[in-house]
Amino acid sequence: MTKMLGLRWTSTMAGALAATVIGSAATVIGTAETEAAECPRKDALGTSRVLSVDPKTYPRVGLKSFPQTLPLADREVVLTFDDGPHPPTTSKVLAALEQECVRATFFLIGQHASEHPDMVKRIAREGHTVGHHSFSHPFMGHIPFEKAIADVDRGIAADEMALHGTSTTTPSTPFFRFPYFESTQAELDLLQSRGIVVFGADLWASDWEEMTPEQQLKLVTERLAASGKGIILFHDNKARTAAMMPAFLRYLRENGYRVVHIVPTGTSQRNADTR
């Protein structure tokens, strides 16, 4: 069993952690891993390890959409959040993660990133991975290929501008999740040719449906107990998710689950050290 360690929430540590990950990038399974830094709160859930994802080996992951997923051990989870940033709720999700010294991945909508660049910088400054989720959240399987890719690129450019002050369609973190998990083969092939990992999910909380935080907690924990591990999808723009998150993290801690933080391989992971 991997020793569970937490994370110290400083940009200096984030930079050191990125250097450690990059230095470990060559492995036989296409990922690199390192233990996380020590957490000031000894009883926190923490982050057990960092997994560096190579797009050549893992171009598409998440069993809900693809035949392959990340190489996670039993009771290992990757926490991912879509559709932010939305300051009223994203800030509460970030606070819950910080309380437990947990790092996650946020797939941002470019329009929201443009509207809330300070929140984007906060996500990165607190050590989380920033991925991409289009600019306007369209149904990409129902629009022309050129229009879909333009929306992908516009979203990446908006996220990069919010993070680094530079508009570019070359993502500093080449992680993308299609809105509604809807894509065409041509879109998937193009992103693969650009070295961008496409993320699905292994399970989700269905937090787009109307339910109480308590109902959501019951639903996602039952699904996790059935699957035993996996990439979990939440939405940080949902008030019910923000309200449920402290209890969910406590459930993970009390039931022996371990959080894995995903980062890109072969990059400087600039978005983990944005001030």
Locations of regions flagged by a protein language model:
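N-terminal pre-catalytic segment of deacetylase/amide-hydrolase enzymes
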Residues: 2-80, 86-99, 215, 249-251, ...
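Acidic (Asp/Glu)-rich catalytic clusters
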Residues: 93-99, 113-131, 191-193, 223-225
